[in-house]
Amino acid sequence: MYRTKVGLKDRQQLYKLIISQLLYDGYISIANGLINEIKPQSVCAPSEQLLHLIKLGMENDDTAVQYAIGRSDTVAPGTGIDLEFDADVQTMSPEASEYETCYVTSHKGPCRVATYSRDGQLIATGSADASIKILDTERMLAKSAMPIEVMMNETAQQNMENHPVIRTLYDHVDEVTCLAFHPTEQILASGSRDYTLKLFDYSKPSAKRAFKYIQEAEMLRSISFHPSGDFILVGTQHPTLRLYDINTFQCFVSCNPQDQHADAICSVNYNSSANMYVTGSKDGCIKLWDGVSNRCITTFEKAHDGAEVCSAIFSKNSKYILSSGKDSVAKLWEISTGRTLVRYTGAGLSGRQVHRTQAVFNHTEDYVLLPDERTISLCCWDSRIAERRNLLSLGHNNIVRCIVHSPTNPGFMTCSDDFRARFWYRRSTTD
């Protein structure tokens, strides 16, 4: 949403409206005090024009509509944190400690990556065993709510029809390291230690192999689709960021070598409007890029005091970047100024993390979540004031390597070196 520039005359008009409203409501002494302080150029008559303007603005302001949606259990993309206007927000969404495990799926090796589809209906998990699973969130919830006697009496056909794992994909020959759903098509992209990016058409139940692939020169570490679905960003063990045309597989890189990182790229993510993307690297820097020119706009040097940057994502309104590093700290950055506005600390009290994981928002961006590697628990903070909430024990038998939160619902997936992926959900009282 674009805002017009506010000038001195606009403020003078605002003060006159405030005085008129105060006079209309009978607060004469307060109005006179304001008149003596501001000294308006013309007489202010009692009026409730300000009240009508506010009511009209609230009825027609898309932001107000989105705000109302954003405080429910299910949200649409576009709502979220905005520190310019969120001073008095009452958090309504559930904190992490209120979630419970609803389903567990197992791989034959460490599970280290997961991703949600844009509508929050599907989750893909990837493993060191080179396999990929696609799970249906509604089926996982239904399975967890099913009485044990009903589950035991299911026929093989019923079990297959109701099974949460709707696809299992095999086409990599080494660990699956990154995953991304296409924004509009039934296509899943995956990257691997086998140096390939593969595209799977999961609309076909029988399809287990990729229909397209890109051969890279290094291990893939992070991928992100352009919101149109026509391009995909690829971060690898090499410091040079790649952008591929999905249809032609033509590769684009910045024309200025100085734009690039100095070490492996750990995280790449587009914002919702595709006019920017952000990268984080083992070199300790976060870079903000122009989504059209493919040039680096800003570099946040030593974003985590020199520690490796593990993740960097945009808030839904693209005003902020949420990052995490191997210093076990999450930070909220204001893009317009490059400042750290909020620091979320306490996840590494028993020692800094060794392995890469992510800081994520919940679906309403009321909370920031970050796994604590040593205690195998989930830290949760109020995203606006960094107040720590109750820890959630994640129930894994080994370190948690990945967390992804639903973009639309109170659910998230954790992936661990214990070979398992756990689906967590906060059921409402009506479920």
UniProtKB/Swiss-Prot annotation:
SMART domains, per the entry: WD40
Subcellular location, in the record's words?
Nucleus
Q: Does the keyword Signal apply?
A: no
Spell out the residue ranges that the record assigns to WD repeats.
106-145, 171-210, 215-254, 260-301, 303-343, 395-431
Q: Name one GO biological process term.
A: mRNA 3'-end processing
Sorted UniProt keywords: mRNA processing, Nucleus, Repeat, WD repeat
Pull one GO CC term from this UniProt entry: mRNA cleavage stimulating factor complex
Q: Which GO terms describe its molecular function?
A: RNA binding
InterPro entries attached here?
CstF1-like, CSTF1_dimer, CSTF1_dimer_sf, WD40/YVTN_repeat-like_dom_sf, WD40_repeat_CS, WD40_repeat_dom_sf, WD40_rpt
Q: Which domain of life is it from?
A: Eukaryota
What the entry lists under PANTHER family is as follows: CLEAVAGE STIMULATION FACTOR SUBUNIT 1
Q: What this chain does, per the record?
A: One of the multiple factors required for polyadenylation and 3'-end cleavage of mammalian pre-mRNAs. May be responsible for the interaction of CSTF with other factors to form a stable complex on the pre-mRNA.
Q: What is known of its domains?
A: N-terminus mediates homodimerization.
Q: How does it assemble?
A: Homodimer. The CSTF complex is composed of CSTF1 (50 kDa subunit), CSTF2 (64 kDa subunit) and CSTF3 (77 kDa subunit). Interacts (via repeats WD) directly with CSTF3. Interacts (via repeat WD6) with BARD1. Interacts with ERCC6.
Q: What is this protein called?
A: Cleavage stimulation factor subunit 1
Organism (species): Pongo abelii
Instruction: Provide the gene name from the record.
Output: CSTF1
